Amino acid sequence: ILGGSSGSGQHRPLPDGDGDNPSSIVDIFGSKATSIPRIQGDPGVRLACRDPQGQPLTAQEVYAKVNPSVVTVVSEQSEGASIGTGVIMTADGYVITNAHVISGGKSCWVALDTGVTYEVNLVGFDEEEDLAVLKADPQNPLPAAEFGNSDLVQVGDTAYAIGNPLGVELRGTMTNGIISAVNRAVEVDGKTMTLLQTSAALNNGNSGGPLINEYGQVIGINTLKMSTTDSTEATVEGLGFALPISSVS
C-alpha cells in the first residue's frame, strides 16, 4: 500500500506481502514498467455500481458473500515475487488490483480462496490512479463481487477489508472499522489522490483488496496507509485509504 505526506506522518503504499524478496516491492510513482503479457485490443470492462438494497448484513454474511471474490495476486519479479490482493470484477475473469502490486512483474497469476490458480494477462495499467486490470481465462464462471456506489458512503458507515496481510499464510483475513473520512485529499510523492479513509486495519499484502460496506458491496480498492517514517513498515494504526470504486468505474 502507498506513500505520501500529511503533517508529520506519511502515507505509504501497503507493501505487498512477504514474497521471496519483499524489498522488491515498489512505490507506484516512479515505479518500473511491467512486462506481464498484455492483451491487445481487449475492450476491457465497465463496472456496474449499485445502490444498497435490503437490510445490512452481519460480518459473517459479508465475509461469506465477498471472500470468494477476493484473490491473491502474485507478480513474479526479476528477483522474488510481489504478493498482493485483487477483486474479481466479472465472471469471465476480469480482476482489479493496484498497479504497484504488479509493477516490474514479468508474469502474474491469481489464486482463488479455493486454491484454484490462473495465470493472467494484463488488460490495463494506470500508475497515476494505482490501478491495474488483469484477465484470467477460466473454464467455469468465477464468483464476481458486487460493487456499490461509493458516492453514497458517509463518515461513520461500517467498513470491512479482506486481503492477504503479510502474505499468503494469512490470506482471507477480514478486518473491520468505519469510514473515517470521504473525499480525503492525500498527497503522494507530489501527486494528489482523492480517497476514502477507513479505520479498518490494512497491512502489507492488502494492496488491491476490497473495502466493503455493510451490504457486502465493494466500495473501494485498498491502497494506502499512514506511516510516521520513511519505512514501508507503517507504525500508525487505523489510518488506511482506498480508491473509491465510483472513480474506478
Language-model-detected regions and their locations in the chain:
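Active-site substrate-binding loop(s) of clan PA
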Residues: 61-62, 121-123, 140-168, 243
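Catalytic-histidine neighborhood of serine endopeptidases
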Residues: 90-92, 96-130, 136-141
